[in-house]
Structure formats: C-alpha cells, structure tokens
Amino acid sequence: MNKKIQDFFLSCKECILENPRSFYGSFSLGPFKNSQSLTVANALRRTLLAELSNIAITHLEIEGVTHEYSTLVGVRESVLDLLLNFKGIALKNTSPVTKPLFGYLQVRGPGVVRASDLKFPPMIQCVDPDQYIATLNENGKLILKFRISDFKNSQENLNFEVSKTFLNIPNFGHFDTSSFQNFENSNFFSSSFFASQKMIKSKRKTKFSQLKVDYLSSFGFSTQHKRSGLNQTQKFAMQHQNPFRIEKNQQDFNKNKNGNFDSQKNKTNSLWVDPLFNPILKVNYIIETIEPMQKNIPNEIVFIELWTNGSIHPRKAFYTALLYLKTMFDKLDCMRLLNYEFSNTMLESEKTSTKFFKTFEYDFRFYNSREDKTMKSFTPEKFFLPEEIEDVEKDYLLNLKNQADNTWNDLPLTNLNLPYRITKILAKNNFFVVGDLLKISPNELKKLSGIGNYCVFILQKRFEKLGLKLGSRNEKNL
C-alpha cells in the first residue's frame, strides 16, 4: 500500500502573472485509475471555487447618500456603479483579520479616483493600485468610509447596522486641505452648491398626521419640526428608499454661518457591496491517458489550470484545496457510525452530549499527531470515545436486546412458516409462541412425544435466521 501512495506526484507546470488581477497557474496530479481521475478532478475544482475565501470590502457609507439609486453632484458614476467598482477591488492581508477593519476616502475634483487613493489599515494591501473607481469634475467631491471583513465575520454580521457615529468625521469646515486630492475650486462650499429647500405647509393637522407622529415616535425619531409638513426633497427620497431600511440620521442638511455644514446632520446609510470573498476566478481541468487503457492500472493524469484575482498565489490556493479535502476525509476516517436511536438516547443527557461534540470537534494538534503515525502504518487506528459515552452505548444495546427478546416472546409459531405437522405437534405439547421454545433445550425437546431429530433440525434453522437459539433463555437463567 505504501508503494501505491508513493506513485502519486504533484507538479506545478507554470505560474504566470498575466496582469495585477489575473494570476495563472497550471498543475498536474496523478497517476490515477480510470475510475478515480474524474472524482479527484471534480472534487478539487469544486473545492477551489467554493471553499477558499479571502477578505473584501463589505459595506460603504458615502456622505450624502441614503440609498443605492442616488447620484452625486460632480461624480460621473452613480452610486450603483461605485458599489460595483468597490466590489471588484481585490485585497490581501499580511496578518490574519480577526475583526472588521475600516478604510477611508476623501477626495474632490477635478480628477480620477483610483484604488491608490484609498486609505487602508496597515495590514491590508490593494492588489491593483491603478484600479479605477470614479471620475470627478470641478464640483465633484467623494467622502466615504468602507468596511473590510473576511467571510466568517461577514456571515456573523450579515445584518450589519451602522451606529450613528459610523462616519465619525469632524466638521468639514475644519478639514486639513492636505487630505483632499485636488483643491482647484475654491468655492466648493458656496451657497449655490446647496440649493435652498422649499417647504410645503399643511393648513391643518389632520388625524392621519397625528397617527404618523405617533408611529415615528415609536422608533425614537424626533417629530417636532420648525415648520409643519415634509420637505419636497425629503418626501421624494423617502418614497424611493427601501421601506425596511431606517435612515441613520433623519435631520436635514443645515448650513452654518461660515458656509459649512455639520456632518452629524447628514443623511447616510450603510450600503451592502455584495462582496466576492473567493479569490479564484476560473478553474479548468483535463484528464489525459499516459498509456493504453488497462484494467485497474493507474494510467490517467489530471491537468488543472486556475486563475486567481492576484490576492493569492495559485500554488498556495491549490495546496489549500488539497489540505481542505485531506482534513475532511480525515474526519470521515475518525468518524464512528452511530445508530440513529443510540445517538438520540445519548444526546438526551447534557453531560454526554457536550463531551460527544468536543470529541468530534476538529483539532489541528490531534490530526498532526495522527499524521505521523498514519505515514508509518496504514492500518486503521481505533478511535476511542469517552468512558461516559461507552457506558451509555452499552446500556442502550442491552435495552435494545431486551426489547427484541420481548418482541420474539409474543410471536406466534404459525408466523415462522413451519411445516403443518411440526406446528400441530408443538401445539399438542403446549408450545404456541417463540418464547416457549426459548426456555427449552434441544435435548429436552427431543424427549417430547412426536418430536424427533428432523423436527429439532427444522426449528434450529428457522431460529438461526431470526438470530435466536433454542434454549437460550434457559442458559441465561443458569
């Protein structure tokens, strides 16, 4: 068996960096038997496309944007286009990411915004700094904050709600000018940039408006306005928002005396980017025969080629997929098949259920220690369960056997399909159910009138098919 395992080989044919966001790798693996090559190739391809994960930008919060269908003044791209551009940004981390991280972007036009303008945490790097994000004209400005997370943290916080201090940017009037990309337009905060908002006054407060005030108050929103009625711009925006999304801040834009405005009064919402965590772009495989097809002789090689987004080397991605499959099958090797009813009985006790799950929990140290032993000897090792679980198993099997015995005790002999003559003779000797024969030995049965060796032989054959034995109940009592 050692010779068969040593016959396998893995070779990296070539790895080519086609562009910063496309890293190509080609590998060969084999030889396999005719029935194994397709299984291995398909398993590797599905693992590469489904099980590998990386970090990505998950949420955006853009200053002045409340929903995905908004547009920004002075920005060529719509908010949907910005979300798609951020979705395509490939990131890699120099150290493990254990919690969500945040980055920033503060630029103004005219100019082109690229990934190099983003401010990332020290442990995060952008694969392609020249990746395009947006184009701004003279009146354009783009101030946003984005969240970076891995797949695990993203699933735990899928219903992510941004706190009211998420943007956490001080008064825009006190910004350091060095934080912006371009400042050619000196009248960026001019009064013409923010048009005055017209108000619609309601003649009287109706019953419906009172219900509206009570409804909004239940969410903690302020219902006291300087003027009755809703702003036209507010009303239009609220009609086109997701009805299940609550705005982070319900206050209007207010200019201050210096022509600036307070960022705490801006309407902002966290926008879901729908990130792509898998760094694998595409996987292909080809199965080739290296010699004439022969039965049960390894003669097929699997050629696999894959493309990554540049955040991971193809060789590392391929080895990670192999390690994932190996770990999964190691679990199956150590798994113990348990009867469904036995597992239910065992899990009724909180003490045994806790130890049961801890026993089968994946532990790197456990599998590393087993790996050395497995390489030396390929005989399967016994997987031991805690003593408490073994005691529960013994009790369960004993109860199951007692229940089975009780079932056979009441089974009529007519259900055994015995010859009519034997059934009639047993009935004359007061044997009507199987439990009656379990109490008497074959020698004692032969002493009865009308029962000979042939009759005992037929009964023993019928009982063996049921897993029973003549006189077994009498032997236990002795």
UniProtKB/Swiss-Prot annotation:
Q: Where is this region: Alpha C-terminal domain (alpha-CTD)?
A: 365-478
Q: Give GO BP annotations, semicolon-separated.
A: DNA-templated transcription
Question: Which reactions are catalysed by this chain?
Answer: RNA(n) + a ribonucleoside 5'-triphosphate = RNA(n+1) + diphosphate
What EC designation does it have? Answer: 2.7.7.6
Where does the signal peptide begin and end? none
Task: Region Alpha N-terminal domain (alpha-NTD): list its residue ranges.
Answer: 1-341
Q: What happens after mutating residue 3 to E?
A: In strain: KS3/2
| One term under GO cellular component | chloroplast
Main location class: plastid
What is a single Pfam family found in this protein's UniProt entry? RNA_pol_L
Name assigned to this protein: DNA-directed RNA polymerase subunit alpha
Q: Where in the cell is it found?
A: Plastid, Chloroplast
Give the family this protein belongs to, as stated in its UniProt record. Belongs to the RNA polymerase alpha chain family.
Q: Which gene encodes it?
A: rpoA
InterPro entries attached to this UniProt entry = DNA-dir_RNA_pol_insert, DNA-dir_RNA_pol_RpoA/D/Rpb3, RBP11-like, RNApol_insert_sf
**Native species:** Tetradesmus obliquus
